[in-house]
């Protein structure tokens, strides 16, 4: 039987090699070995995704590579999902997070990773998908009364819609009842401060840690 480090390395390699089958194999090996799915995802898949993201930023990999890596990660997580749900059922939910890619933006890679990691961390995650209308975020926030409403923007042209969300949550009279988080490649702490968002998620891990801290406070 493969050891823990070996399985984690295989999970990471499956992402950097864009290999969905290998990602599923690593996940199955992890389950057989009784490993914690969170470890496999954080140290294996997410570490691989981080590497791919860095290479993409440096211009050595391109969008099709990032998409292929994201598909491999998705394939691996799907295998681990039932075990994660089982473990999650035994623990209390930390809070509810509504997440989606903002209106006009069809990119979902970063958002998908954050949603997966929040799920793993023990949050109830309502993923609205990509290119989500502002009014949908507001309606869902009214209906579900979440702790956090998180939006991702991958383009400077769609970032402005994060301002619209802040405004419309205020108009609906619920801005004071939820905390907002913004993230995405062009988004910065300065932007979050400027529009009045509560949290800026620089990376998936950063987003999870800050959401945990925000809910405790």
From Swiss-Prot:
Keywords from the UniProt entry: Cobalt, Metal-binding, Methanogenesis, Repeat
Molecular function per GO: cobalamin binding; cobalt ion binding; methyltransferase activity
Pathway(s) annotated for this protein in UniProt: One-carbon metabolism; methanogenesis from trimethylamine
Residue ranges crossing the lipid bilayer per the database entry: none
Annotated binding of methylcob(III)alamin, by residue: 107
SMART domains assigned to the protein according to its UniProt record, in alphabetical order: B12-binding_2
Domain (B12-binding): residue spans on this chain: 94-217
A Pfam family this chain is assigned to: B12-binding_2
Summary of subunit composition and partner proteins: Can form a complex with MttB.
Family the entry assigns: Belongs to the methylamine corrinoid protein family.
Name of the protein in question: Trimethylamine corrinoid protein 2
Name of the encoding gene: mttC2
